[in-house]
Amino acid sequence: MTNSNRIKLTWISFLSYALTGALVIVTGMVMGNIADYFNLPVSSMSNTFTFLNAGILISIFLNAWLMEIVPLKTQLRFGFLLMVLAVAGLMFSHSLALFSAAMFILGVVSGITMSIGTFLITQMYEGRQRGSRLLFTDSFFSMAGMIFPMIAAFLLARSIEWYWVYACIGLVYVAIFILTFGCEFPALGKHAPKTDAPVEKEKWGIGVLFLSIAALCYILGQLGFISWVPEYAKGLGMSLNDAGTLVSNFWMSYMVGMWAFSFILRFFDLQRILTVLAGLAAILMYVFNTGTPAHMAWSILALGFFSSAIYTTIITLGSQQTKVPSPKLVNFVLTCGTIGTMLTFVVTGPIVEHSGPQAALLTANGLYAVVFVMCFLLGFVSRHRQHNTLTSH
């Protein structure tokens, strides 16, 4: 593989995470405006965003098999066509059914692109370098989570319709589409070059189960937490602007943490540092949930920084449970994380309705504690050390 080709594929991976980050995180910013647009209460509007998460979940799950049937370049180019259709649907339809369908399509495109992006990184890089590359890739999710809410706020403050926010997000996919030209992708399945070596049946092991539970609980905990921080902060007497700043600070700190840990992780055993970070994140979230408004800004900055490497390290360790990185295994762990995304409002909505936003934040805290337990148990069964030793010889 040429260096310029590797750079193009790496940038496709970066932008695939930026696309998903923008779509998922911008939801909270535009939900109120979309509810007004359709004359619906915000609570029932949040349910329609489940279509976005369902699209992401289904496409990541199915793409574990589709990658071996449909070439990656074809998938990305077809995704561009779907993206144009979905954004056009949002702009020109006033029907809630069409809005839900467009959200589902956006989810499908996002899920396919993100699973391809993750696979490309696990395919091109090995060992600890894979972990730091995946972490840097994931930082684009946070970067988009910081940039696109600012773009949304800029547009909405000037009474520009909410669907232009999605048109701006579509520009990320335009960049991905342009990068596919003159770029060679790894061939998989029936398109892969034939070898005489027999294909070894891979055994995943119980470590994959622990990592999958950790992925689900981490994403559900993180999004359950960050989705209700503004409501919780407003309940404590903070202004909407200050509450929004808390969320922006979290993602900014998260992004800085990813850049820092993409360097730091090279010097540590991944399972051990993951356990330490998961424990720290659970403690810092508890400090935020039980602290005073004066300390909230500092505790959310610390939480963002120390939790930034958790999800990517879970995926990296998942890919290292077999000798050869398996798209099915990586996609399985990703799917579990996406189930967490999909369950965000399903789980936290009723909790907030009955017990208020703080109860949702404490539930998220409990989920982070589960992540810590799973990471600790992984230490007894993980195969990443033996596979790293094999690849280094």
Swiss-Prot record:
PROSITE patterns: MFS. Signal peptide: none annotated. It is a multi-pass membrane protein. It comes from the Bacteria. Keywords: Cell inner membrane, Cell membrane, Membrane, Transmembrane, Transmembrane helix. The chain crosses the membrane at residues 11-31, 51-71, 78-98, 101-121, 134-154, 162-182, 206-226, 245-265, 273-293, 297-317, 332-352, 361-381. Its main location: membrane. InterPro entries: MFS, MFS_dom, MFS_trans_sf, MFS_TsgA, MFS_TsgA-like. PANTHER family: L-FUCOSE-PROTON SYMPORTER, PROTEIN TSGA. This is Protein TsgA. It comes from Escherichia coli O17:K52:H18 (strain UMN026 / ExPEC). The gene is tsgA.
